[in-house]
Curated annotation (Swiss-Prot):
The modification N6-carboxylysine is found at K124. It comes from Pseudomonas putida (strain GB-1). Gene3D superfamilies: IlvD/EDD C-terminal domain-like (3.50.30.80). The active site is at S515. InterPro entries: Dihydro-acid_dehy_C (IPR042096), DihydroxyA_deHydtase (IPR004404), DiOHA_6PGluconate_deHydtase_CS (IPR020558), ILV_EDD_C (IPR056740), ILV_EDD_N (IPR000581), IlvD/EDD_N (IPR037237). Pathway: Amino-acid biosynthesis; L-isoleucine biosynthesis; L-isoleucine from 2-oxobutanoate: step 3/4; Amino-acid biosynthesis; L-valine biosynthesis; L-valine from pyruvate: step 3/4. This is Dihydroxy-acid dehydratase. Homodimer. The keyword Lyase applies. Mg(2+) binds at D81, D123, K124, E489. The gene is ilvD. Keywords: 2Fe-2S, Amino-acid biosynthesis, Branched-chain amino acid biosynthesis, Iron, Iron-sulfur, Lyase, Magnesium, Metal-binding. One of its GO terms (biological process) is L-valine biosynthetic process. Functions in the biosynthesis of branched-chain amino acids. Catalyzes the dehydration of (2R,3R)-2,3-dihydroxy-3-methylpentanoate (2,3-dihydroxy-3-methylvalerate) into 2-oxo-3-methylpentanoate (2-oxo-3-methylvalerate) and of (2R)-2,3-dihydroxy-3-methylbutanoate (2,3-dihydroxyisovalerate) into 2-oxo-3-methylbutanoate (2-oxoisovalerate), the penultimate precursor to L-isoleucine and L-valine, respectively. It comes from the Bacteria.
């Protein structure tokens, strides 16, 4: 049987000093024989998705101690992408993922913790903690803060979210009063932004990976039902410890649960629900940390056979996360994938012996369990609040309409090909990514003239100054992991194109990335990035570019000979922006850039550079 890791600091005469310090934290004699379970919280008052997490770590801690464990809580940082967006703050967002992963590793290994409860929610926090969990490979469970309620206003016939506020603000025809009303209404409660943006996408994927409880991705932050997820997580992590340390059951370890097949399940879910393209970046990074050979070619393969079974804002205005929950949440989508013969159902999870068993219990179309049906009726109260578990509103009925509802069956899919696609071509030899769920079918094949911008800032200025015309393909380069550094999100350029009426008349290609709130023909993650010698750095104003989503291709319509000549010329100049950018790149960001790989590798550190150290 494996020993508790914590035995290193709790047992033996030589550890008297360490035990003295443990006692100063409140531990007693009997506690030194129990598993020490780390609670990695991410509470901060900077982020609406985390503002309500302050007391939830102790809620979990009390449940852990009731179940026979010792709980010790610590905090990580959390960056709000929406607040950091549109200025140099966005340079820090993706690098914060690595800092979070390192922080969890540092705390857990420094104190020899036996297991982890990860309390995450927003964009980089769940991925960072997931990377750490797979590095450490000790029992873990994820429980997130949950999505916020969609906004409501008499000025709109649909639920609102952050993107609506951004788009209306960029619309010069909208009055100041209307903009103010949207601003006040778009984000009414605590929780991660209400659409299928990056945060909610990742929290849903933890369910598919088998590392979180059913409902983790869809139960509203404000709803009383979410409290039970935290309490159950506390009990479950102690049970996982007993199985691993007491029974030598390695099937409960994260690398046993989140194996190659589980990553395929998670990616199939992402494609089926039209999730954020950022999830591709984060899944690739997590796979590397878990030593799972899952790469962009696997994602390309899956994208060709998985239909889109769910459509949520920003891909459609009608539905938000509260509607996904009402339709049965993630296990209803997984159930549809299973019945379509795609899902791997023989895999264990932290809560069930197999995914098949979990679907039978939690898919509302497969179970008659009234408690499960009641759980998925949890809905919004429409009351602005920053308090978790503060309301208990329920829908009168479930949305189990698989023909016209939020979640569809295979036979009635929104589209037979899923919501994400990987494109390859001479402009992106290692691939680039587009969220097809947000692209109008009329522009799935698009040929246009390149309009070059050397930064997101210059692109925003150009779009607002009407320099971009219908038929243009906006190229924003040197914004990759290394070139930015930090791989900024491009939500403002896409929002402004939309507000200018160019959402279906233009495309955008970048080696940066996009917010989960992005829609339109927006192609990101171009790899290799410009700063790494990628061909996106060779494009010139007026060059023709052909995008062909059905054939998964994107090509610069320039001869190989011309490209070779341009490469020789660029090698002499150096792979850097053609214009000076007024951007302060600190030592911390330079350190990140030094080791950063391109997006096709998940933008993780280049471990080859560290070998031998």
């Amino acid at each position: 049987m494996p020993d508790y890791r914590s035995k290193t600091s709790t047992q033996g005469r030589n550890m008297a000093g360490a035990r003295a310090l443990w006692r100063a934290t409140g531990m007693k004699d009997e506690d030194f024989k129990k598993p020490i379970i780390a609670i990695a919280n991410s509470f901060t008052q900077f982020v609406p998705g985390h503002v309500h997490l302050k007391d939830l770590g102790q809620l979990v801690a009390r449940e852990i101690e009731r179940a026979g464990g010792v709980a010790k809580e610590f905090n990580t940082i959390a960056v709000d992408d929406g607040i950091a967006m549109g200025h140099d703050g966005m340079l820090y967002s993706l690098p914060s993922r690595e800092i979070i992963a390192d922080a969890v590793e540092y705390m857990v290994n420094a104190h020899c913790a036996d297991a982890i409860v990860c309390i995450s929610n927003c964009d980089k926090i769940t991925p960072g903690m997931l990377m750490a969990a797979l590095r450490l490979n000790i029992p873990v469970i994820f429980v997130s803060g949950g999505p916020m309620e969609a906004g409501k206003t008499k000025l709109a016939s649909h639920g609102l979210d952050l993107v609506d506020a951004m788009v209306i603000a960029a619309d010069s025809s909208a009055s100041d009063e209307k903009v103010a009303e949207y601003e006040r209404s778009a984000c009414p409660t605590c929780g991660s932004c209400s659409g299928m943006f990056t945060a909610n996408s990742m929290n849903c994927l933890t369910e598919a990976l088998g590392l979180a409880l059913p409902g983790n991705g869809s139960t509203l932050a404000t709803h009383a039902d979410r409290e039970q997820l935290f309490l159950t997580a506390g009990r479950t992590i102690v049970e996982l410890c007993k199985r691993y340390y007491g029974e030598n059951d390695e099937s409960v370890l994260p690398r046993s649960i989140a194996n190659f097949k589980a990553f395929e399940n998670a990616m199939m879910l992402d494609i089926a629900m039209g999730g954020s393209t950022n999830t591709i970046l984060h899944l690739l990074a997590a796979a590397q940390e878990g030593e799972v050979e899952f790469d962009l070619r696997d994602i390309d393969r899956l994208s060709r056979k998985v239909p889109q079974l769910c459509k949520v804002a920003p891909n459609i205005q009608k539905y938000h996360m509260e509607d996904v929950h009402r339709a049965g949440g993630i296990f209803s989508i997984l159930g549809s994938l299973a019945r379509g013969g795609l899902l791997h159902t023989d895999l264990p999870t932290v809560h069930s012996r197999s995914m098949e068993e979990a679907i039978a219990k939690w898919d509302i179309t497969q179970t008659d369990d009234e408690a499960v049906h009641t759980f998925f009726k949890a809905g919004p109260a429409g009351i602005p609040t920053q308090t978790a578990f503060s309301q208990s509103t329920r829908w009168e009925t479930l949305d189990d309409d698989r023909e016209n509802g939020c979640i569809r069956s295979f036979e009635h899919a929104y589209s037979q090909e899923g919501g994400l696609a990987v494109l390859y071509g001479n402009i992106a030899l290692d691939g680039c990514v587009v969220k097809t769920a947000g692209v109008d079918e009329s522009i799935h094949v698009f040929e246009g003239n390149a309009k070059i911008f050397e930064s997101q800032d210059s692109a925003v200025r150009g779009i607002l100054a009407d320099e971009v015309k219908a038929g243009d393909i906006v190229i924003i380069r040197y914004e990759g992991p290394k070139g930015g550094p930090g791989m900024q999100e491009m939500l403002y350029p896409t929002s402004y194109l939309k507000s200018k009426g160019l959402g279906k008349a233009c495309a955008l290609l970048t080696d940066g990335r996009f917010s989960g709130g992005t829609s339109g023909l927006s192609i990101g993650h171009a790899s290799p990035e410009a700063a790494a010698g990628g061909a996106i750095g060779l494009v010139r104003d007026g060059d023709k570019v052909l995008i062909d989503i059905p054939n998964r291709s994107i090509n610069l319509l320039v001869s190989d000979e011309e490209l070779a000549e341009r490469r020789v010329e660029q090698d002499k100049k150096g792979w850097k922006p053609a214009e000076v950018r007024p951007r302060k790149v600190t030592t911390a960001l330079k350190a990140y850039a030094l080791l950063a790989t391109s997006a096709d590798k998940g933008a993780v550190r280049n471990k080859a550079m560290l070998e031998g150290l």
